[in-house]
Amino acid sequence: MAFNNTFKFAPAEWLPFQDTEVLDKVVNMDIRAHQGKNFENPDFELKVVFDVHNYFVVDLFQRIRLSDVKNEKLVVILPSPENAVFLSVVEALNKYKVSTRNVHVFFLYEYANEKGEVAPWQSPYSRSGHFIRYFYNRLDAELRMPMENIHFWTKENIETYSDEIEALGGADVVYTALSWSSGIGAIDPEGFPAKTTEEFLKMGSRLVTPMAEMIVHDSLRGMFGCSGDIANVPPRAVTVGPKDLMASKEWIDVEYLISCGGAIAQQKFPLQLAMFGPICPENPGSIMRLHKGTCYVCPEVATPGNTLPDYDILERIAEIRKKEENL
């Protein structure tokens, strides 16, 4: 019996980007073939590299080292948990006696509960707490930045977090990674509703309810047992806004997440949509193309998605046995 592909359907109604013509186009775009500075901002570059983690580590270490050598302030916006990165950077800082005294750290986003109460860094449910455990506490005491240089989220500073960053002259660098539907951390169209790109780019820090896909995704993290324990993931988050990303002097995006225990790169399509879809509020990741920076992509994410052909397992077994009999 012959099969055909006449079955059509629309994207799930809750998904922010609905243009099927664009979706069908970008899914076939080759990340590797579009490497380089081929985007709206000539200072934005797309690069496929074998060890994205290493590029992240080297970039952050070098910026901290220069802030020490030149005795200049360095303001960074960090995603967390990035424990492997934190450990590697700290090992180098300790080895070469590099001081972080001039470094100010802000966090891309943090968990909050249904009441809008922000997880304190001492909580096992805090993203920024991982920075303290795997970076600050492991750094030699004489090399540490003052605790007041670590700008934690609180319930009181949700609306003013962007102002705190701006008061220090904006971020010198922001590090990000894409989430589902081309979101940037907890920045997605639902939490940042805007009619125009211009309006979207002016939006600052706030309390949001992440997309359901983000809750499911986070349930696969080590801090939640890599188990799919959806009910154990805090339901809300506080996050910086597009305004803070665009005000940074440089933007480094890293795409190297794979599923726990597997090689399925869930960032493939979000990256394709961000790189090749329209720049608009419904496609948050696309705004990085307007900014100076680099998007580092691991080979697993850069490899096009694939669907294995369907087949009748009994027919396949019969074919194998027939070949064996003819040997």
Model segments located where?
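ATP/nucleoside-binding phosphotransfer catalytic cores, i.e., glycine-rich phosphate-binding loops
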Residues: 2-22, 31, 36-56, 240-327
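Ligand-binding beta-strand-loop-alpha-helix segment within the catalytic cores
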Residues: 18-44, 53-57, 98-175, 232, ...
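Glycine-rich phosphate/diphosphate-binding loops that line cofactor/substrate pockets in enzymes
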Residues: 59-72, 245-246
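Glycine-rich N-terminal segment of FAD-binding domains in flavoprotein oxidoreductases
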Residues: 66-97
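Gly/Ser/Thr-rich loops at beta-strand to alpha-helix junctions
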Residues: 76-86, 179-184, 259-260
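A glycine- and small-aliphatic-rich helix-loop capping segment at beta-alpha/alpha-beta transitions
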Residues: 89-100, 122, 189-200
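Class I SAM-dependent methyltransferase SAM-binding "motif I" and its flanking Rossmann-like core
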Residues: 181-234
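A general structural motif
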Residues: 230-239, 279
